[in-house]
Amino acid sequence: MNAYTTAAYEPADRQQLFALMRSVGRSHIDDAEFEWWFERNPSSPQLISLAHADGRIVGIAAMSFFRTLVDGREELTAVPVHVATEAQFRRQGVFSELELRNEDEAAAVGAPLTVTFPNAASHRIFVQDLGWRDLPGKRVWARPLRAGAVARYALGRESNRGGLRAPSLDARGGVAPLDRFGPDAGDLWQSTTTGNQFVRDENFLNWRYVDSPRDYRRFGAYRGEELRGFAVVGHTVKHGVSSGFLADLVAPEETERVALLRRCVEELAPGTDALIALVPRGHRRAFLRAGFLPTYKRIRFVGKSLDGRALPGANWHFTLGDFDFF
């Protein structure tokens, strides 16, 4: 066992934190990303715990906070993000100790629950070691864009092509690019929301998709001057697949949903393999009309009560924009 100590993040730790993230293959963290995610989140006190050994940082576990509708009430939900442990300190309880430290801090600032989307390795730790509970997972849907993409994925052949097209100001089919979100976007979300989900008001939407250092394309569907829906699309490469991803979609009627989905497809450059999404049950027909199909892949979802109340087990709605890595 290697000796280490734990402590809260201090500003002087930032460069060592970045170095650890890069060393474990998570190099997207830089000053701009850090300041946006941790310092400008409109609903988030900064919560980062570190493990130190021999004068360096060997472990990190952070949490972000999001205003969330839970059983019709607005609550503050804590979400673990940006976790890393130096190789020689793995399987020694570093992550578990940092995570429990964060859970205690989150409860102290008023978050009654915490949820996350674990990978295969962290799922066992969350559920078996830390007392989290499995919640209904979410199936990934995909709109294939290249005929050979599925076969190439099955064979493990990676793609580095595709991406987002150059930005265009063109309005087509009642859908136009959105520069920033106004109050009408938050009002639209409020009028259509069902189930348990993160609050999408004007401040959140602009922080998440406009002020971000990441590249997102935002579109609004209009009837005359009235906003009737909006969508956000981005691009990533995961497991060798060049994928567009639907970060968000809010539209009360199927016509606008389909129009927005088709515009998101058009925004992806040649070489992109697919556009992926998480699909609410009531939206499935619109996604089928836009060429999406359900895949075999499901995203794990786990949660834990921090105040002793029963954890809502069903009726959760998430989008890929709710993940810290999209």
Region annotations inferred by a language model:
Residues 112-163, 232-258, 262-326:
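Active-site/acyl-donor-binding loops of N-acyltransferases
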Residues 1-38, 42-57, 63-65, 75-79, ...:
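Short amphipathic alpha-helix that is part of the acyltransferase structural core
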Residues 85, 90-104, 254-267:
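Conserved acetyl-CoA-binding loop-helix of GNAT-fold acetyltransferases
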Residues 51, 63, 85, 233-235:
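GNAT/GCN5-related N-acetyltransferase fold signature
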Residues 182-236:
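Non-catalytic interaction/regulatory modules that flank or connect domains
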Residues 74-87, 241-252:
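Conserved acetyl-CoA binding element of GNAT-fold acetyltransferases
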Residues 56-60, 226-229:
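Glycine-rich acetyl-CoA-binding "A-motif" of GNAT/NAT acetyltransferases
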